[in-house]
């Protein structure tokens, strides 16, 4: 595994024209943040040694190096999901590579179903903690020496970055929620009973990604900031049939607000 990580990092280092310390993983419907990136170098996942290939509609599958405002960044346009059949090691492989390339801060975004009755479709929820409901753990097996065998997860999402985001949202007049994200394997959307269970467990939103990458980032010593776009509601009386297209539409409508917060945060760290 370590050899593969180093091989991929060496390949990318030879192509890179910048030295980013910040990376972004862009989720469903949020890939258009790439239009803000200047001085771009793009490479398709299929052309990167050892990289899996994303199969989800709306995920274009590219690694992008460039500038967002005045900061060098690395962006993943399209992520890998456990439900696609990848192992957890494959899902999180790009995060290991980020660590090898010198990334210090990771921004993650996703689309999620809200289980909190105070949430509305289109809300941005700053993730302050998560619950890992996946059946497999990304650190299962031999420890990769980027971090300890038993990593601390008491601050999986940086409090400093959360405070900065709240400050920016207030300054820009953007409404944000805060909450706990629960990650499940999918690919089915949740039943009403599952939504109810997740809420009882302490989750405010549920989705099919993010948690594995965040666990690995924490193991590697990378600071994390995460945001969910609430694209459907799993609240009694508000549950309706949901499709991938509707999720995408809600995420696209939230994109300008997400872009503003992400751009400002990256330029202020």
Residue positions per predicted region:
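Metabolite-binding pocket within alpha/beta catalytic cores that recognizes anionic/polar moieties
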Residues: 1-153
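Non-catalytic positions within long, well-ordered alpha-helices that form the structural scaffold/packing
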Residues: 99-102, 199, 218
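Short acidic/polar active-site loop segments enriched in Thr and Asp
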Residues: 104-105, 204, 223
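Polyanion-binding loop/helix "lid" in catalytic or ligand-binding cores
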Residues: 146-157, 183, 195, 250-259, ...
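Active-site/ligand-binding-proximal alpha/beta "capping" segment
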Residues: 162, 167-204, 262, 269
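Zn-dependent metallopeptidase/amidohydrolase metal-coordination segment
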Residues: 208-246
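His/Asp/Glu-rich mid-to-C-terminal helical/loop segments that flank catalytic regions of hydrolases
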Residues: 235-269
């Amino acid at each position: 595994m370590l050899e593969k990580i180093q091989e991929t990092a060496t390949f990318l280092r030879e192509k890179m024209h910048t030295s980013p310390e910040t990376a972004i993983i862009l989720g469903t419907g949020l890939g258009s943040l790439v239009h803000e990136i200047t001085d771009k170098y793009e490479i398709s996942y299929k052309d990167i040694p050892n990289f899996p290939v994303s199969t989800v509609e709306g995920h274009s599958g590219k690694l992008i190096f460039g500038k967002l405002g005045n900061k060098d960044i690395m962006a993943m346009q399209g992520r890998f999901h456990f439900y696609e059949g990848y192992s957890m090691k494959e899902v999180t492989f790009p995060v290991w590579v980020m660590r090898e390339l010198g990334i210090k801060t990771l921004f993650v975004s996703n689309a999620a179903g809200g289980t909190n009755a105070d949430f509305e479709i289109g809300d941005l929820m700053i993730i302050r903690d998560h619950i890992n409901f996946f059946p497999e753990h990304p650190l299962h097996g031999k420890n990769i020496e980027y971090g300890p065998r038993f990593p601390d997860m008491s601050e999986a999402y940086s409090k400093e970055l959360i405070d900065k985001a709240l400050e920016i949202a207030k300054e820009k007049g953007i409404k944000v929620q805060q909450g706990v994200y629960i990650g499940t394997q999918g690919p089915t959307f949740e039943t009403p009973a599952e939504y109810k269970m997740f809420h009882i467990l302490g989750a405010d939103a549920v989705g099919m990604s993010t948690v594995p990458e965040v666990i690995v980032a924490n193991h590697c010593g990378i600071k994390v900031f995460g945001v969910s776009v609430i694209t459907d509601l799993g609240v009694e009386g508000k549950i309706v049939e949901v499709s991938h297209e509707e999720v995408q539409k809600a995420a696209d409508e939230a994109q300008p607000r997400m872009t503003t917060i992400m751009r400002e945060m990256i330029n202020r760290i």
